[in-house]
Amino acid sequence: MNGLEAAVQAAEDAAVSVRTYVPGYPITDLAQALRCQISVNEKVALEIALGASATGLRSMVVVKQVGMNLLADPLVISATHGIGSGVVVLVGDDLGPRRSQVEMDSRFYAPLSELPLLDPSRPGLLHASLLEAYTLSEKLRIPVMVRVTSQLLAAQEENIPSRPLPSTGQRLEKESWSLTAKGRHQRHHDRIMALAQEASESSSLNQFQISGDVGIIASGHPASLAQELGVSVLALAYSYPLPERLLRRFIDGHRLILVAEEPEPFIESILSQNPRIKGKLTGHLPRGALESSDIIQALEKLEGRPDKMPQAYESVAERGYEGVCPDCPFQVLFSSLAKVDAPVAGDAGCSIQATRQPFCSADVAYGLGSSAAVASGFSGKGIALMGDYALAHSGLAGLINAVWQKRDLLAVVLKNEVAAMT
């Protein structure tokens, strides 16, 4: 069973009734295997899930890392306003990134929203983490996040038994409305996060492997890599909140510690005041995704300062460029825009192809659906280029704003009736 299949089994075991998603690598295949309902954008996807939760239905939201930016508003608010039945946000980080406009570490949304995040390392732990996430979500009445990567979804593991988690039918309680926003936040700190901290400390999903005086603290896929090296490893179930007592015991029992995580030094930055802690911040490990060879080399040089090697920035020519689809009907449009004497705003959908060879006709491309708002900020006339999915996702708001402000722009919508850049 691979990680994708383990997640599907967990959703069935947990009797998850409402499943929403927004397509995007690396979670599109996962969401379709989960039979999720596509949503117009990530904010709406989470809001549907919150509504289902309030009325007693377990729900799951599946998004890629950049989707966390859009659903942050209801996510942060739901932490203190409470929920009914369990809500899990299953987020896929595109490490590399292969099909994203930016590399992001979604774990940073956990302390921002003050919500727990589990970061499993292999398919069996992904299955168990999802069940634990629903149990914790209903106990604390808050959403819980679980992070996956393409490596985890593709990893294989045998004998992952089904473990049904019957639905509780728990509905939203209205007691939150008796408190002010300040009072809800106080309660969240005093009661909810204290229970989340204890869940992180006592989770049976934390894994120990003791061997020698050098230890590795790891989460996610790097934990599975570290466990193959025959050294001491503490594989964390939760990236947030971190199990402080567990970490202290492990660190105190070892002379040096390497923190292996990806893509950013999220855990290391919390532990970095201890000079025995090494990792990405100290230059022992590279930023971004990790391979076994990275961890092995770091262990070999853990005693001293790592060699500072000049870094070559990855180029499109080096990595390779997929290009537009051979039968893309918009190639003539992209070529024609290069001849127009006006700035062109694309976005993260198919219109991003206009920024590249052989067209080079779009000047800027930010988030999905951003082109109308960006073009309305140009100093003079401008052109906004977006797909029909980008228009529905968030582009319509930019168009309404441009009309209201009487901005001089031409909006071109690429109608292909599909979210193709996923």
Regions found by a protein language model. Name each.
Residues 30-33, 48, 73-77, 225-229, ...:
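A short acidic, amphipathic alpha-helical/loop segment
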Residues 71, 98-100, 154-157, 224-227, ...:
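Short helix/loop capping segments that flank catalytic or ligand/cofactor-binding pockets
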Residues 62-63, 88-92, 145-149, 217-219, ...:
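Short beta-strand segments
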Residues 1-17, 120-324, 329-333, 338, ...:
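Flexible, low-complexity linker and terminal segments
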Residues 1-123, 151, 273-422:
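Thiamine diphosphate
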Residues 18-20, 60, 215-217, 258, ...:
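Conserved beta-strand elements of the Class I
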Residues 27-31, 99-107, 224-225, 242-246, ...:
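Short, glycine/polar-rich helix-capping loops at beta-to-alpha or helix-loop-helix junctions
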